[in-house]
Amino acid sequence: MSHRFPAGSILFLVRPPYGDRYSYVMRPLRYSINVTLDGCCDHRAMFADEDLFRHVVENLEQADALLFGRVTYEMMEAAWRPPARPGTRPDWMEPFARTIDAAKKYVVSSTLERVDWNAELVRGDLGKAVQQLKRESGKGLLVGGVKLPLALAELGLIDEYEFVVQPRLAGHGPTLFAGLSKHVDLKLVSRLEFGSGAVAMRYEPRR
């Protein structure tokens, strides 16, 4: 049985750090998103099963912290912060729920006055703030959502992109990276197929 789930759910594997426009080695910033065959990234158009969630948990366990914008943070908090109402999700979602609940989170927002749920606000210049987070030691930062990754891609700060292509046609948007001002050339580094027909494709920028 498949279930819908927020698009901000993270599906990352550890990759070696790569240089970015700031030109020195830092812990890598990775982005993962679910997308339909016709390019829709609305989480309501997605579905997930136990195999995909197992992949999500394995990847989350290799993360130091999550990076969200306000909308994704609020969506994920509403979906996954305890306590869950009994019977609202299957047992195989519980490892993901526990892992994301415990994770350190950074929230980029100029409007929120405070956050909790193991979270810390990130304000000011986005490039400098994320650069500082990347300088810290660790395994990597994971970013989810749609709008924040667009800004990070513009700054050349994303070190890995993972697109989990769902075997579905949605017939509507939103789409990824709408308004991106320049091409970002990528090279495929891995491909993983799931029994559902979904395919996780991981790319690194061509530097």
PLM regions with names:
Residues 1-25:
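N-terminal amphipathic/basic-hydrophobic helices that include classical n-h-c signal peptides
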Residues 18-207:
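Enzymes that bind and transform nitrogen-containing heteroaromatic metabolites
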